[in-house]
Amino acid sequence: MRAPPLLLLLAACAPPPCAAAAPTPPGWEPTPDAPWCPYKVLPEGPEAGGGRLCFRSPARGFRCQAPGCVLHAPAGRSLRASVLRNRSVLLQWRLAPAAARRVRAFALNCSWRGAYTRFPCERVLLGASCRDYLLPDVHDSVLYRLCLQPLPLRAGPAAAAPETPEPAECVEFTAEPAGMQDIVVAMTAVGGSICVMLVVICLLVAYITENLMRPALARPGLRRHP
């Protein structure tokens, strides 16, 4: 049985379902008793070992939900970046318990690609208890690269050789221009309004056809006699 044209039009103009939030896999959500994260933003130059000690609380209950957030998570990696609409990026990572016991800190390096070379944007030293970091004020339409490297514990006097540091994991992303997002939202709203108007017009035409024109067509014509 074929569906009526009006039902097909309603199905075509129906708004798309809301985008579901990106699920949080086990290990990404911080535990309720997770400690505060100590970190230092390291300056560029010869005094790179300085920096003011700061603290941040873990990002509990965070969900990356479109269109206000875009998730960049390379397959098989323990590092992911959530690019928010306010031009900030939440970087999250996870470690196995055995590997976490061998880490004394994390080194985060940020860079962005220009026309001919890459430019550093931020270097952060994070404590071993840190599992996320918020990078504020990224530029639109610029390819960023964030690399996180676990730093092993310092070898004691009895150790034969220092432990080799693990390789850094990196994630790349580009922040979408906020103006383009507003244009997309506006076009979606206008398209939805046009669909609603078409549905109303179709309903009016169907009502006029069923209730006004059919009785007039069914009424027999009156013939005039001389």
Swiss-Prot record:
Pfam families assigned: Fndc10
Cellular compartments per GO CC: membrane
Annotated glycan sites: 86, 109
Lipid bilayer topology: Single-pass type I membrane protein
Cytoplasmic side: 204-226
Keywords: Glycoprotein, Membrane, Signal, Transmembrane, Transmembrane helix
Signal sequence segment: 1-20
Transmembrane segments: 183-203
Cell location: Membrane
InterPro entries assigned to the protein according to its UniProt record, in alphabetical order: Fndc10
Protein name (Swiss-Prot/TrEMBL): Fibronectin type III domain-containing protein 10
Taxonomic classification: Eukaryota, Metazoa, Chordata, Craniata, Vertebrata
